[in-house]
């Protein structure tokens, strides 16, 4: 029997004999009774097993070290006077596999820095068990959200010849030691994808509502708490949709995911609130229960200018139209001014991607970023440029290889009305939901500069 089943069926199992196999989290010998705390990975909550000298295998059980595997046969009994509602009184304990004495994860607290060095073991700790349970649940919630709304899930390619962001920070894919791409596997320069958006946009023209959810890669030599070389992106795309539709979809999705975690992972959330970020649950409640605000980029610039005039200190205090807002500016807007998650719209075209729809003022594009208290930008999206001539002109302005993107640009020639979508960095979302302060702690095996240990 799994420990999760014991907790789910505890009232039906009272005084019933059960058998389970689990891992030892702690083992303490007492004068008259001894206590073993077990978990088999099926639930966040540990199960207490009580055993005595008359328990079959008693001497063997006493020797069970942390992380050893045991088989327990015993009865479920109520313990209303204790912290837990019930426990298992063991009739027999078998030590199936003994962990080594210097097992790296002992009962003492370990730093996250140390645990990153043993990423193959850290999921056994309470902290990372909670984080990765929430990550799993959030991934399921994303698929459920889009599936319930009629979206088609597509698998965009991992290997591509396109750089959707135009930043040139892609990992090259090659079978050669030289740079002769014509003789390479694909007979051209290839790289790992930085975004599935362009391919999603093509499929949206066939299915109307699509989304990708998969790994993306950036060869950005940045050793910060927010950057990783490999991460996951959620990228929906909706044909015949504009920026207003996009904003509504973002708000609905973010609230849905948080609500799902509250419903299905409350225990893990409470642990994160206690151990990772004090006030986490209040923060998430404010997001899921509030109406998101909308502010234009131009309005945001004026707000920031006024803040500087009133004496507020920003690290970057030269606030002018064209500034690429930093985290400090984003957090000021949503935390100090709007006091709510905030959509900032209509950014200058010079600081946004080539494929975004140009507004009538010829200065801004129909872009949107969702800013949330605590971290700043969480989601970035836009309505896409639907005018072929404008798109080609913009590609030339920013030195995008038109021939390389011919297939994408030509979508506008085959019946193209509107399209809008966004990208949400999955790890950044998990950081926000769990209170984890470093992206390395929300990815099972993080890939960062100078780090490829596993």
Curated annotation (Swiss-Prot):
The keyword NADP does not apply. It catalyses: tRNA(Asn) + L-asparagine + ATP = L-asparaginyl-tRNA(Asn) + AMP + diphosphate + H(+). CDD domains: AsxRS_core, EcAsnRS_like_N. Pfam families: tRNA-synt_2, tRNA_anti-codon. It is found in: Cytoplasm. Its main location: cytoplasm. GO terms for molecular function: asparagine-tRNA ligase activity; ATP binding; nucleic acid binding. GO terms for biological process: asparaginyl-tRNA aminoacylation. Coiled coil: none annotated. Its EC number is 6.1.1.22. Keywords: Aminoacyl-tRNA synthetase, ATP-binding, Cytoplasm, Ligase, Nucleotide-binding, Protein biosynthesis. GO terms for cellular component: cytoplasm. Homodimer. Belongs to the class-II aminoacyl-tRNA synthetase family. This is Asparagine--tRNA ligase. It comes from Mycoplasma capricolum subsp. capricolum (strain California kid / ATCC 27343 / NCTC 10154).
């Amino acid at each position: 029997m799994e420990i999760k089943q014991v907790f789910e069926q505890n009232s039906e199992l009272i005084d019933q004999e059960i058998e389970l196999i689990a891992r030892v989290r702690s083992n303490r010998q007492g004068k008259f009774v001894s206590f073993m705390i077990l978990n088999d990975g099926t639930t966040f909550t540990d199960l207490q097993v009580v055993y005595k000298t008359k328990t079959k295998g008693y001497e063997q059980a006493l020797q069970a070290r942390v992380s050893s595997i045991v088989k327990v046969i015993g009865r479920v009994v109520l313990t209303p006077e204790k912290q837990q509602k019930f426990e298992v009184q063991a009739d027999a304990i078998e030590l199936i596999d003994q962990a080594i004495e210097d097992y790296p994860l002992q009962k003492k607290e370990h730093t996250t820095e140390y645990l990153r060095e043993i990423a193959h073991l850290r999921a056994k700790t309470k902290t990372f068990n909670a984080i990765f349970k929430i990550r799993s649940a959030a991934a399921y919630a994303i698929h459920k959200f889009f599936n319930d709304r009629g979206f088609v899930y597509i698998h965009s390619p991992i290997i591509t010849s396109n750089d959707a962001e135009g930043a040139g920070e892609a990992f090259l894919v090659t079978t050669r030691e030289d740079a002769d791409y014509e003789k390479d596997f694909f007979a051209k320069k290839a790289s790992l994808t930085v975004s599935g958006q362009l391919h999603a946009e093509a499929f949206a023209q066939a299915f109307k509502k699509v989304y990708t959810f998969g790994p993306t890669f950036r060869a950005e030599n940045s050793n910060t708490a927010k950057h990783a070389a490999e991460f996951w992106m959620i990228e929906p795309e909706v044909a015949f949709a504009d920026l207003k539709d996009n904003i509504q979809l973002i708000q609905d999705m973010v609230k849905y995911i948080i609500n799902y975690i509250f419903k299905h992972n409350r225990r893990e959330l409470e642990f994160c609130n206690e151990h990772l970020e004090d006030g986490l649950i209040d923060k998430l409640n404010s997001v899921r229960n509030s109406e998101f605000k909308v502010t234009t980029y131009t309005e945001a610039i004026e707000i920031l200018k006024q803040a500087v005039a009133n004496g507020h200190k920003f690290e970057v205090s030269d606030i002018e139209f064209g500034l690429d807002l930093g985290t400090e500016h984003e957090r000021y807007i949503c935390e100090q001014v709007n006091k709510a998650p905030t959509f900032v719209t209509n950014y200058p075209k010079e600081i946004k991607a080539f494929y975004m729809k140009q507004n009538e003022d010829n200065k801004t594009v129909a872009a949107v970023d969702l800013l949330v208290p605590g971290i700043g930008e969480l989601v970035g999206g836009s309505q896409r440029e639907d005018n072929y001539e404008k798109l080609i002109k913009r590609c030339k302005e920013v030195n995008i290889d038109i021939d390389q993107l011919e297939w994408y640009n030509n979508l506008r020639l085959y019946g193209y009305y509107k399209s809008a979508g966004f990208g949400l960095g999955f790890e950044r979302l998990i950081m926000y939901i769990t209170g984890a302060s470093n992206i390395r702690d929300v990815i099972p095996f993080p890939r960062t500069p100078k780090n490829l240990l596993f």
